[in-house]
């Protein structure tokens, strides 16, 4: 890994292909220094993509991109990953320079009904968002092409339908995003050999934690080591969890670079040379 100004560059390629900006990384709730989960992905010949859209993400997005220009990819529908989207509905409908076309929205099977209910001004009704979004549902392991990027969703271990995402550009540069998950074989497969693994680490390690919910720093490091990733970026750390302890746990299991992301950081993902 080498450091660039103003971005951190990951890998040893000669051309920057994919950039990911942290719009929010606080786990489970909005934190004092960060919105909940949200990541802006930019690549050549590809419209800007926002992965997850938790509380506060719309405000952070305005510092980095035009909200009317983005398409949205949701890992799952827990509130801290999607409930700033009704604000984007308003932006796309009522901004004086609102876009004429629809944005793409990918997510779990009940995305349309769940977000429509959240956006509706009336209880028991669904806001029909088909005027502003073209909604698609993930299918496990079925690739989706958006611009120059190939995105492969994988079902992971979480109480609700939840997907990790593997994103690859034409050069072979690869990023895996865990979403929310417990430790599972699918997560290791998702991250196998990627250049960058953006992985949740919601708590420090303890046998008392329930299974199939979240990862500890220890488990994030174990998955990174088993998958043979090049660099581990930790995210989704709640305000009540020690970042330093989570980082130390991950480093004890994974001997590659480990970093806990913060809001507004941008990382460049490059294929191993």
Curated annotation (Swiss-Prot):
Q: According to the lineage, what is the superkingdom?
A: Bacteria
Pfam families in alphabetical order: Lactamase_B_2
Gene Ontology, cellular component aspect: plasma membrane
Q: Which Gene3D superfamilies match?
A: Ribonuclease Z/Hydroxyacylglutathione hydrolase-like
GO terms, molecular function: 3'-tRNA processing endoribonuclease activity
Family statement: Belongs to the AtsA family.
- Add the further remark from the entry: Was identified as a high-confidence drug target.
State the name under which the record lists this protein.
Uncharacterized protein Rv1339
Species for this entry: Mycobacterium tuberculosis (strain ATCC 25618 / H37Rv)
Q: What is the lineage of its organism?
A: Bacteria, Bacillati, Actinomycetota, Actinomycetes, Mycobacteriales
């Amino acid at each position: 890994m080498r450091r660039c100004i103003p971005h951190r560059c990951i890998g040893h390629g000669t051309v920057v292909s994919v950039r990911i900006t942290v719009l929010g990384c606080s786990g489970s709730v909005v934190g004092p220094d960060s919105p909940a989960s949200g990541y802006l992905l930019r690549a050549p010949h590809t419209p800007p993509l926002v992965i997850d859209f938790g509380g506060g993400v719309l405000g952070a997005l305005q510092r980095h991109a035009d909200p009317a220009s983005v398409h949205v990819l949701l890992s799952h529908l827990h509130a801290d990953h999607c409930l700033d989207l009704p604000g984007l509905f308003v932006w796309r409908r009522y901004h004086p320079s609102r876009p004429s076309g629809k944005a793409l929205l990918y997510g779990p099977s009940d995305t349309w009904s769940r977000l429509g209910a959240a956006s509706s001004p009336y209880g028991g009704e669904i806001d029909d968002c088909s005027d502003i979004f073209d909604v698609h549902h993930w299918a496990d392991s079925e690739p989706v092409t958006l611009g120059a990027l190939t995105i492969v969703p994988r079902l992971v271990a979480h109480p609700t339908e939840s997907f990790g995402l593997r994103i690859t550009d034409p050069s072979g540069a690869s990023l895996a995003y865990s979403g929310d998950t417990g430790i599972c074989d699918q997560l290791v497969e998702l991250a196998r050999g990627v250049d960058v693994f953006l992985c949740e680490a919601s708590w420090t390690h303890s046998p008392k934690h329930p299974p199939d919910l979240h990862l500890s720093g220890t488990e994030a490091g174990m998955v990174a080591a088993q998958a043979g990733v090049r660099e581990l970026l930790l995210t989704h750390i709640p305000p009540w969890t020690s970042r330093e302890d989570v980082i130390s746990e991950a480093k004890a299991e994974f001997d590659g670079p480990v970093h806990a992301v913060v809001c507004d950081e941008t990382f460049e993902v490059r294929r191993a040379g």
